[in-house]
Amino acid sequence: MSTLGHQYDNSLVSNAFGFLRLPMNFQPYDSDADWVITGVPFDMATSGRAGGRHGPAAIRQVSTNLAWEHNRFPWNFDMRERLNVVDCGDLVYAFGDAREMSEKLQAHAEKLLAAGKRMLSFGGDHFVTLPLLRAHAKHFGKMALVHFDAHTDTYANGCEFDHGTMFYTAPKEGLIDPNHSVQIGIRTEFDKDNGFTVLDACQVNDRGVDDVIAQVKQIVGDMPVYLTFDIDCLDPAFAPGTGTPVIGGLTSDRAIKLVRGLKDLNIVGMDVVEVAPAYDQSEITALAAATLALEMLYIQAAKKGE
């Protein structure tokens, strides 16, 4: 079975239309795209409420509400005029085979990166970030991680496929450097001795955005950065449609401002994960995810326009 655009892809949640109504391209490796969007409809590693496999479709669907604005506020330019972005649809794999998903996603990412493309990926549960990190580390070397989440996902439970273990595994594999990595919005228990800088939700909500960004930049330095945003970083008032919601999170306004503040970092890959639309209200979680994804593209476009 091919990785993209297979005629026998029997998923009910794949490949309806592109993010922001961007063109679909099932052969992105040979395209002239700068950034390639890939959906990963996978939720077998979920510990809470399942349904993240429907996340990519929900993000794409609600993104049509964002497609009309050309000179987007407050950027005052159209990202699409500076970046060539294509959507290659969803990863096709044998549903029920977590190992195949992981291997195919890593191979897909490696092929895109070798062709000079950058990736914005939509989960799916947060486990999908691990094969993406493996591919990016092969191409860019050890990276810094900027991680928005309610949970650190550094738990060691011995399970190969678990959306709470990726950032325990990634440092051990040499993919990321915890000493140059930041976890933002955390509000569950975590290990204070694993090297990561944790900016918990209490302090992020109380501190100024510029102050937080300055600390992030200081920690990350000039390392290549992988940016991952678990939508449960947001308070459930702003993102109820997720598998493991935790009260006391960030507002959507604060999250957007923090993402915009990352513009000067050397970001080499990005993802937005853990949207589970079955638990959403009026698509507000999917809209938050789509908006954050769009802001991620805008910070790339802003650098290209300088």
Curated annotation (Swiss-Prot):
> What is the reaction catalyzed?
agmatine + H2O = urea + putrescine
What biological-process terms (Gene Ontology) are attached?
A: putrescine biosynthetic process from arginine, via agmatine; spermidine biosynthetic process
Which keywords label this protein?
Hydrolase, Manganese, Metal-binding, Polyamine biosynthesis, Putrescine biosynthesis, Spermidine biosynthesis
What the entry lists under CDD domains is as follows:
Agmatinase_PAH (cd11592)
Q: Which InterPro entries match?
A: Agmatinase, Agmatinase-rel, Ureohydrolase, Ureohydrolase_dom_sf, Ureohydrolase_Mn_BS
What stretches pass through the bilayer?
none
Q: Which GO terms describe its molecular function?
A: agmatinase activity; manganese ion binding
What EC number(s) does its UniProt record assign? 3.5.3.11
Write out the pathway annotation from the protein's UniProt entry: Amine and polyamine biosynthesis; putrescine biosynthesis via agmatine pathway; putrescine from agmatine: step 1/1
- Give the matching PROSITE patterns: ARGINASE_1, ARGINASE_2
Cofactor dependence: Mn(2+)
Q: Does the keyword Zinc apply?
A: no
List of residues binding Mn(2+): H126, D149, H151, D153, D230, D232
Recorded hits in Pfam families, A to Z, give: Arginase
Say yes or no: keyword RNA-binding present.
Answer: no
What is the role of this chain? Catalyzes the formation of putrescine from agmatine.
The entry assigns this protein to a family as follows: Belongs to the arginase family. Agmatinase subfamily.
Query: What is this protein called in UniProt?
Result: Agmatinase
Q: Which organism is it from?
A: Escherichia coli O7:K1 (strain IAI39 / ExPEC)
Which lineage? Bacteria, Pseudomonadati, Pseudomonadota, Gammaproteobacteria, Enterobacterales
